């Protein structure tokens, strides 16, 4: 575990969140948290809901605490600066074509959310519009407007017509460009689709993975299991130093992305399984014992990131 440093934005107001340890004990047993030099505009992913304010004006922004009332805001200090131009472009388009935002109470209206992803090293931008219909009227005009934004690489829609708090639909359709953007963590290149899980803070992610690599102290002959591996971000990072890496993830699309990411990086010592970690790992050990009588599989390092 790590503790907040003495000069910190995160004071000891809730020691329970640190496992119930007192600040005095944490000082002795834990290293300081590794913070950011500039903790602003660091998120590579943002999701904004659309709705109407009390005056009936279409807005986007963030939900007020414990409500689904939207506080209008297109300029968030945590997201990338390109978000504002994208949001204002969409709002202008909706106004021009008198397009209604989704209303949770009635189930009517078109636009529910927009997902924006940004590649910090590649400068590529993805926009995924979540809609309560099969298509967007005058869609070609919106695509034309979004295309003009520097770095735009992928424009997609995801249909979600369910009465649910889940943001994304089950799939997506490409309107323009690629189905993904790319970005790097260290020297590893990743393809990121609208439904991919990818760490939202790339600066801290590289620090985190660097520490994981340091603690693992890999010499090149180890077997590593990465449980809850997502699209293989840390699996592939560790595969550079390990003999063999196995990744486990319950979401099939994430495993497809992980396999693609291994392929585009030319990494052949990473294998990925779809399923629950508590089922895949024992199953692998049992199968190994049957195939290799008298031998027992073992993991030198296990990474857990649920």
What does each of the following model-derived ranges do?
Residues 13, 138-306:
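Rossmann-like S-adenosyl-L-methionine
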Residues 9, 27, 184-186:
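A short, polar/charged loop/turn motif at coil->beta-strand junctions and beta-hairpin connectors
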Residues 5, 73-76, 195, 245:
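Short, flexible active-site loop motifs that bind/organize anionic cofactors or intermediates
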Residues 5-6, 80-81, 203:
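Short, conserved micro-motifs enriched in small and acidic residues
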Residues 11-173, 210, 214-221, 292-306:
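SAM-dependent transferase fold signal centered on methyltransferase-like domains
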Residues 5, 9, 110, 194:
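Exposed loop/turn and edge beta-strand positions of beta-sandwich/beta-sheet ligand-binding modules
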Residues 1-15:
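Short, small-residue-biased leader/transition segments that mark boundaries at the very start
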């Amino acid at each position: 575990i790590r503790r907040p440093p003495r000069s910190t934005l995160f004071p000891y107001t809730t020691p329970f969140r640190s496992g119930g340890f007192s600040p005095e004990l944490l000082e002795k047993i834990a290293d300081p948290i590794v913070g950011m030099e500039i903790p602003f505009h660091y998120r590579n992913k943002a999701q904004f809901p659309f709705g109407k304010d009390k005056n009936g004006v279409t807005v986007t922004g963030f939900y007020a605490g414990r409500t689904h009332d939207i506080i209008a805001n297109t300029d968030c200090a945590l997201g990338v600066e390109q978000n504002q131009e994208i949001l204002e472009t969409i709002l202008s388009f909706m106004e021009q074509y008198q397009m209604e935002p989704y209303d949770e109470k009635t189930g009517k209206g078109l636009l529910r959310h927009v997902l924006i992803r940004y590649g910090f090293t590649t400068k590529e931008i993805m926009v995924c519009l979540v809609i309560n219909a099969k298509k967007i009227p005058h869609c070609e005009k919106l695509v034309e407007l979004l295309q003009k934004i520097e770095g735009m690489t992928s424009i997609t829609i995801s249909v979600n017509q369910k009465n649910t708090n889940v943001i994304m639909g089950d799939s997506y359709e490409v309107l323009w460009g690629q189905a993904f953007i790319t970005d790097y963590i260290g020297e590893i290149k990743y393809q990121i689709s609208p439904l991919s899980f990818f760490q939202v803070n790339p600066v801290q992610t590289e620090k985190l993975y660097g520490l994981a690599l340091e603690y693992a102290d890999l010499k090149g002959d180890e077997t590593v299991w990465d449980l809850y591996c997502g699209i293989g971000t840390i699996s592939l990072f560790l595969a550079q130093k390990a003999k063999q890496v196995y990744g486990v993830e319950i979401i099939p699309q994430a495993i497809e992305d992980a396999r693609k990411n291994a392929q585009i990086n030319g990494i052949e010592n990473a294998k990925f399984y779809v399923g629950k970690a508590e089922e895949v790992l024992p199953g692998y050990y049992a199968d190994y014992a049957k195939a290799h009588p008298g031998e027992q599989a073992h993991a030198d390092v296990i990474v857990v990131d649920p």
